[in-house]
Protein backbone atom coordinates (compact mmCIF):
# COMPACT_ATOMS: atom_id res chain seq x y z
CA UNK A 1 0.00 0.00 0.00
CA UNK A 2 1.41 3.37 -1.04
CA UNK A 3 2.19 5.74 1.83
CA UNK A 4 0.00 8.90 1.76
CA UNK A 5 2.83 10.90 3.35
CA UNK A 6 5.92 10.06 1.29
CA UNK A 7 4.43 7.92 -1.56
CA UNK A 8 6.74 4.99 -0.79
CA UNK A 9 5.27 1.81 -2.27
CA UNK A 10 5.65 -0.57 0.69
CA UNK A 11 4.10 -0.60 4.13
CA UNK A 12 3.58 -3.22 6.79
CA UNK A 13 0.34 -4.04 8.59
CA UNK A 14 0.61 -3.21 12.30
CA UNK A 15 -2.98 -4.01 13.32
CA UNK A 16 -5.95 -5.55 11.53
CA UNK A 17 -9.55 -5.96 12.67
CA UNK A 18 -13.08 -6.09 11.23
CA UNK A 19 -15.17 -2.93 11.43
CA UNK A 20 -18.41 -2.76 13.42
CA UNK A 21 -20.58 -4.24 10.66
CA UNK A 22 -18.04 -6.84 9.61
CA UNK A 23 -18.18 -5.81 5.95
CA UNK A 24 -14.76 -4.16 5.90
CA UNK A 25 -11.36 -4.71 7.49
CA UNK A 26 -9.63 -1.78 9.22
CA UNK A 27 -5.86 -1.97 8.97
CA UNK A 28 -3.23 0.22 10.64
CA UNK A 29 -0.16 0.37 8.46
CA UNK A 30 3.35 1.71 8.93
CA UNK A 31 5.41 3.06 6.05
CA UNK A 32 8.70 1.21 5.68
CA UNK A 33 10.41 4.39 4.49
CA UNK A 34 9.23 7.31 6.66
CA UNK A 35 7.79 5.28 9.56
CA UNK A 36 4.48 7.20 9.68
CA UNK A 37 1.28 5.28 10.34
CA UNK A 38 -1.99 5.43 8.43
CA UNK A 39 -5.29 3.57 8.32
CA UNK A 40 -6.87 1.75 5.40
CA UNK A 41 -10.30 0.17 5.08
CA UNK A 42 -10.56 -2.84 2.81
CA UNK A 43 -13.64 -4.56 1.47
CA UNK A 44 -14.17 -7.51 -0.82
CA UNK A 45 -14.66 -6.41 -4.39
CA UNK A 46 -18.03 -7.76 -5.34
CA UNK A 47 -19.28 -8.28 -8.84
CA UNK A 48 -22.43 -6.21 -9.10
CA UNK A 49 -24.77 -5.89 -12.07
CA UNK A 50 -24.56 -3.17 -14.69
CA UNK A 51 -27.05 -0.34 -14.24
CA UNK A 52 -29.29 0.38 -17.23
CA UNK A 53 -29.76 4.14 -17.34
CA UNK A 54 -32.96 5.88 -18.52
CA UNK A 55 -31.40 6.57 -21.93
CA UNK A 56 -30.41 2.90 -22.38
CA UNK A 57 -26.71 3.30 -21.56
CA UNK A 58 -25.17 0.70 -19.31
CA UNK A 59 -22.59 1.51 -16.67
CA UNK A 60 -21.10 -0.31 -13.69
CA UNK A 61 -22.87 0.16 -10.37
CA UNK A 62 -21.16 3.03 -8.56
CA UNK A 63 -21.63 2.79 -4.81
CA UNK A 64 -20.15 6.23 -4.15
CA UNK A 65 -22.46 7.87 -6.69
CA UNK A 66 -25.50 6.35 -4.97
CA UNK A 67 -24.21 7.26 -1.49
CA UNK A 68 -23.63 10.86 -2.66
CA UNK A 69 -27.19 11.10 -4.02
CA UNK A 70 -28.68 9.77 -0.80
CA UNK A 71 -26.45 12.05 1.30
CA UNK A 72 -27.67 15.03 -0.72
CA UNK A 73 -31.29 14.06 0.00
CA UNK A 74 -30.45 13.64 3.70
CA UNK A 75 -28.52 16.91 3.99
CA UNK A 76 -29.36 18.76 7.23
CA UNK A 77 -31.57 15.86 8.30
CA UNK A 78 -31.06 13.58 11.32
CA UNK A 79 -29.80 10.69 9.18
CA UNK A 80 -26.32 9.42 10.01
CA UNK A 81 -23.68 8.44 7.48
CA UNK A 82 -23.76 4.99 9.08
CA UNK A 83 -27.50 4.67 8.31
CA UNK A 84 -26.86 5.61 4.67
CA UNK A 85 -23.97 3.13 4.44
CA UNK A 86 -26.18 0.34 5.83
CA UNK A 87 -28.93 1.24 3.36
CA UNK A 88 -26.50 0.92 0.44
CA UNK A 89 -25.03 -2.28 1.93
CA UNK A 90 -28.55 -3.80 1.94
CA UNK A 91 -29.06 -2.73 -1.66
CA UNK A 92 -25.76 -4.31 -2.75
CA UNK A 93 -26.66 -7.57 -0.99
CA UNK A 94 -30.06 -7.56 -2.67
CA UNK A 95 -28.45 -6.98 -6.08
CA UNK A 96 -25.97 -9.82 -5.55
CA UNK A 97 -28.64 -12.22 -4.36
CA UNK A 98 -30.82 -11.42 -7.38
CA UNK A 99 -28.17 -12.92 -9.66
CA UNK A 100 -29.10 -10.40 -12.37
CA UNK A 101 -26.37 -9.22 -14.73
CA UNK A 102 -28.16 -5.90 -15.37
CA UNK A 103 -30.59 -3.84 -13.32
CA UNK A 104 -32.62 -0.80 -14.43
CA UNK A 105 -31.81 2.44 -12.62
CA UNK A 106 -35.57 2.75 -12.07
CA UNK A 107 -35.50 -0.35 -9.85
CA UNK A 108 -32.61 1.08 -7.81
CA UNK A 109 -34.38 4.42 -7.41
CA UNK A 110 -37.64 2.83 -6.32
CA UNK A 111 -35.83 0.66 -3.78
CA UNK A 112 -33.95 3.66 -2.35
CA UNK A 113 -37.19 5.66 -2.12
CA UNK A 114 -38.90 2.81 -0.25
CA UNK A 115 -35.99 2.68 2.21
CA UNK A 116 -35.89 6.47 2.66
CA UNK A 117 -39.65 6.53 3.22
CA UNK A 118 -39.16 4.54 6.41
CA UNK A 119 -36.01 6.44 7.48
CA UNK A 120 -36.85 10.11 6.88
CA UNK A 121 -39.83 11.39 4.91
CA UNK A 122 -38.23 14.73 4.05
CA UNK A 123 -35.21 12.91 2.59
CA UNK A 124 -37.67 10.67 0.72
CA UNK A 125 -39.39 13.68 -0.90
CA UNK A 126 -36.04 15.28 -1.77
CA UNK A 127 -34.76 12.06 -3.38
CA UNK A 128 -38.07 11.56 -5.21
CA UNK A 129 -38.03 15.12 -6.56
CA UNK A 130 -34.67 14.52 -8.24
CA UNK A 131 -35.20 10.87 -9.16
CA UNK A 132 -38.66 11.34 -10.65
CA UNK A 133 -37.77 14.67 -12.29
CA UNK A 134 -41.02 16.43 -11.40
CA UNK A 135 -41.97 18.71 -14.27
CA UNK A 136 -44.05 21.11 -12.20
CA UNK A 137 -45.40 21.81 -8.74
CA UNK A 138 -48.53 19.73 -9.43
CA UNK A 139 -46.48 16.53 -9.73
CA UNK A 140 -44.56 17.47 -6.60
CA UNK A 141 -47.77 18.13 -4.65
CA UNK A 142 -49.21 14.83 -5.88
CA UNK A 143 -46.22 13.00 -4.40
CA UNK A 144 -46.67 14.86 -1.12
CA UNK A 145 -50.38 13.94 -1.05
CA UNK A 146 -49.48 10.27 -1.60
CA UNK A 147 -46.97 10.50 1.24
CA UNK A 148 -49.57 12.00 3.59
CA UNK A 149 -52.03 9.20 2.77
CA UNK A 150 -49.55 6.50 3.79
From Swiss-Prot:
HAMAP family: NrdR. This is Transcriptional repressor NrdR. Belongs to the NrdR family. Residues 49-139 form the ATP-cone domain. A zinc finger (unnamed) spans 3-34. GO terms for molecular function: ATP binding; DNA binding; zinc ion binding. GO terms for biological process: negative regulation of DNA-templated transcription. Pfam families: ATP-cone, Zn_ribbon_NrdR. InterPro entries: ATP-cone_dom (IPR005144), NrdR-like_N (IPR055173), RNR_NrdR-like (IPR003796). It comes from the Bacteria.
Amino acid sequence: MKCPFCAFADSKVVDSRPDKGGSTIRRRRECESCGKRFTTHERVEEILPLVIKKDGRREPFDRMKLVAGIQKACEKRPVSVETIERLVDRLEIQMQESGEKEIPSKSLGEWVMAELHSIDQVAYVRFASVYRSFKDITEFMSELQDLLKK
